[in-house]
Amino acid sequence: FVPDYSCEEKAICYGITGGVAKYISMFDSDKSLDDNIADLYFNPSGFMYEEPRNLLVQEFRNATVYDDVVSAIANGANKVVEIKDKTNLESASVHNILQHLLETRIIEKTYAITEENNKKKVMYSLSDGMFMFWHKFIPRAVAAIEIDNGKQYYLSQVKPKLHEYMGEIFEKMCRQYLLMNAFSNKFSCTVLQAGKWFGTNPAKKEQTDIDVVGLDTTENKAILGECKFRNTPMDKKQLEELMDRDGLIDKRYKVAEYHLYSLSGFTDWVKDNAVALNVRLIPIEDMYN
């Protein structure tokens, strides 16, 4: 739909629409990404300005309560107790609403990969990028949008945060890339399952995560990956931090290789040492090719 956009712009386009063809088709390929976002989201007559709430009204009787829960998740409440605190709803109501949102695939339940039976390691997130982008940025912009200052609001308040917003979405894209290429012989093992690991690093006694974990469940091999959607190249420190985490997933799995996924490439040190350290470097351009 937007063939002339850069890989970065295509990724952002995907990240704010959830990849829904209907929404992407509304992007005018003759306009810049900024103009398209401003026209569709930050404009009183833009199609996306009221789309998420309209969908909730169509789907649920008490749409306002569902909107509150979706908003809480979009803004960082990933566990039931956190959602309860942000919405002031009872636990039973939160569980009921979450179940309905799961059924409609607006949200998804995420487990720490290799620890799916650990009920303490469960997080909720928005599976739909359009809902995520809208609930993260539009409610605070309503006053500006209604007096036709939406584009200025977007350029000053939202555009500088797009890379941060894309962080979680880029991780999902990288996991999808891993699965899509499972049988391409690109990697040193056949990835049959991909996810994210999160929990406590016992050595450092701190919370941490591994952005990408690809498992070859037949050979008990794993690929560990780190993802950065930033304007700076990935460096030695980020690679070393990834390699330090290889003992955190289930001990059945032996690490076959490491992956670094990057919007802005890699430092010379990383490129010079990648082969020796068993690291595969994957710039965003390779993901689109």
Question: Each predicted region: which residue ranges?
Answer:
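Short, surface-exposed connector motifs at secondary-structure boundaries
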Residues: Y5-S6, A77-K79, K251-A256
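Winged-helix-like regulatory helical subdomains adjacent to P-loop NTPase cores
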Residues: L33-D85
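Short hinge/gating elements
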Residues: R53-L56, V80-V81, E116-N117, Y153-Y165
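Short amphipathic alpha-helical interaction segments
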Residues: N88-T104
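A cross-kingdom feature that marks ATP-driven nucleic-acid transaction machinery
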Residues: V122-N289
